[in-house]
Design a protein with these regions (language model features):
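Conserved ATP-driven motor cores of ASCE-family P-loop NTPases powering translocation/secretion/packaging/pilus
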Residues: 197-299
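P-loop NTPase motor domains
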Residues: 1-205, 220, 230, 279-283, ...
Length: 335
């Protein structure tokens, strides 16, 4: 149960951990005790809604308390029971605050359509590496209200595929899974992505991170942004004006050696001439040169080789371009 959202302050750490403890207890109960048809997010929400804590009555028991009491009688060493007893160490006022925090964080799931989305597994994410599959995740580029759902999806996808690669296929999926993460900055933070990007490749999984600028990545992943970039074997720059990106691309390109000749002439009683020769280092492309790069050009950096300055691919020359709606409006896919 990962409950830590963006912008959590160190002073709020107690409440985040308390929420996580409570979620862990409830999810443990659902996982081990609930029937298969109730092992879903909706059951978790219903259990939270059935929870209640009273400041003036420490002995009050809500329906969830009674459920765990019966479970403890049956199995005192049950994982969920141990987690719940830790949560119950909180006094009535503290427990009430924890429940309010849970309710506030999960408020979006009060929307009926979102609950229904979480009730059943219709996507079978764990089968994507078994056969050729195309999964389109379409999100709004102006409203980020539900971007956290996409973040949950990607987290689940990577975890399921890595587990299946290890447990079923001996470490590598039979069909390569390529994740084209367009507008990566808009899907929210994927927990531990800086570690995933380094380990998924061995499972036959790759990720293409598409950003408007490097600063977008740093805004979301902070110090881990450099780790993420460092684990990408290929960098493709299509153009841009953001200063941080221009600086990093210029540094990646390195320097070239130029020959410098300086001549001097001194006039006096006698005329003398001087010639000075030296080798100097100059950026292969300066930041201002990259900023005004022709729109039809791109820079490609592959690990282990020098960068390429190349023409962008003309998509109209692709053999399957005729199937796109750009080529023929009749091909437009209406959802």
């Amino acid at each position: 149960a990962n409950t830590k959202g963006d912008g959590e302050k160190s002073g709020e750490d107690f409440w985040v951990k308390a929420e996580k403890l409570y979620y862990t207890a409830l999810i443990g109960y659902i996982w081990y005790e609930a029937p298969d048809e109730e092992k879903n997010f909706t059951t978790l929400l219903e259990m939270i809604n059935a929870s209640e804590a009273r400041e003036d009555d420490e002995d009050f028991q809500n329906p969830v308390d009674l459920m765990f009491e019966r479970l403890e009688e049956k199995d005192p060493e049950h994982f969920a029971v141990k987690q719940y007893k830790k949560y119950k160490l909180a006094a009535g006022k503290t427990a009430k605050s924890i429940l309010i925090s849970c309710g506030a964080r999960l408020a979006p799931f009060d929307i009926k359509e979102l609950r229904e989305l979480m009730e059943t597994d219709e996507m079978e994410l764990d089968t994507i590496g078994d056969r050729k599959t195309a999964l389109f995740v379409i999100i709004s580029d102006t409203d980020d209200t539900f971007n956290f759902v996409v973040s949950i999806l990607y987290t689940q996808l990577f975890n399921l595929l890595c587990d299946k690669a290890d447990d079923v296929y001996g470490g590598r999926l039979p069909v390569h899974v390529r994740c084209l993460l367009d507008e990566f900055a808009n899907i929210g933070q994927i927990p531990k992505f800086e570690k995933l990007i380094a380990t998924i490749r061995s499972r036959e999984i790759s990720a293409s991170i598409i950003l408007q600028s490097q600063s977008q990545l740093k805004a979301i992943y902070k110090d881990n942004a450099d780790t993420i970039v460092g684990n990408c074997d290929t960098t493709l720059f299509l153009g841009g004006k953001e200063k941080t990106t221009l600086k990093e691309i210029s540094e990646i390109l390195g320097k070239e050696t130029i020959d410098s000749f300086n001549t001097s002439e001194t006039r006096g009683r006698e005329l003398s001439h001087g010639l000075n020769y030296q080798k100097l280092g100059k950026e292969l492309m300066t930041q201002d040169e990259i900023a005004v790069m022709d729109g039809g050009k791109c820079i490609l950096q592959l690990r282990g080789v020098r960068p390429f300055f190349s023409d962008k691919f003309d998509i109209t020359k692709h053999p399957k371009y005729k199937y796109l709606s750009d080529a023929d409006p009749k091909n437009a896919f209406d959802m």
